[in-house]
Amino acid sequence: MRHYEVVFIVHPDQSEQVPAMVERYQSLVTGQNGAVHRLEDWGRRQLAYPIQKLVKAHYVCMNIECNQATLDELEHSFRYNDAVLRHLVIKTKKAPVGASIMMKSVEREEARKASAEAAAVQAE
């Protein structure tokens, strides 16, 4: 089986449906003897360019190990899901270890917001 990094962008109005979508895609991969090595929800982020007149969307990254038939079925489900604006599948040499660079920046951003809120509460 081969390793892949899958990133998909979900319509911002469907953000509350993301956990169910991720669960469905995980079960699709694991149900056919695949494995999900890393799953990261990057949250709602600014798009590089407008897609369908939207400037923000919900990003999800999955690192999986599966066969070609499973990957084809996963891409088919992305293509026919109207909530998925874009998706990208990249073949990788091995399973990743640790958090991705994007996830680290998301965590730094959240920590900065939390410290700013704590400072605002202490100032009052």
From Swiss-Prot:
GO terms for cellular component: cytosolic small ribosomal subunit. GO terms for biological process: translation. The keyword RNA-binding applies. GO terms for molecular function: small ribosomal subunit rRNA binding; structural constituent of ribosome. CDD domains: bS6 (cd00473). Keywords: Ribonucleoprotein, Ribosomal protein, RNA-binding, rRNA-binding. InterPro entries: Ribosomal_bS6, Ribosomal_bS6_sf, Ribosomal_S6_plastid/chlpt, Transl_elong_EF1B/ribsomal_bS6. The keyword rRNA-binding applies. Belongs to the bacterial ribosomal protein bS6 family. Binds together with bS18 to 16S ribosomal RNA. This is Small ribosomal subunit protein bS6. It comes from Bordetella avium (strain 197N). The lineage of its organism: Bacteria, Pseudomonadati, Pseudomonadota, Betaproteobacteria, Burkholderiales.
